[in-house]
C-alpha cells in the first residue's frame, strides 16, 4: 500500500465512522422508517467506499432527501 492509498483510505474512514456510530448507537433506538434497500445510512457508507468522500456524501445526501413519503422506495443500489 502506497502513501496515496493509505491517505485515501484514512479520509474515507473519517467520513464512514460517524455513519457507523449512528448505525450502532442511534438507529436501533428509532423505528425502522427507511423506504429503501439498502438503508440510507448503508447506502452512504457504500457510496463513500466506492466514490470517495465528496461524491459519496453528495450521493448519500441526495438519497436521504428522497427518503420521504413522496419520494421513491424499494431496491436502490449505489450506481
UniProtKB/Swiss-Prot annotation:
SMART domains: Haemolytic. GO terms for cellular component: plasma membrane. It is found in: Cell inner membrane. InterPro entries: Membr_insert_effic_factor_YidD. It comes from the Bacteria. It is a peripheral membrane protein. Keywords: Cell inner membrane, Cell membrane, Membrane. Belongs to the UPF0161 family. Could be involved in insertion of integral membrane proteins into the membrane. This is Putative membrane protein insertion efficiency factor.
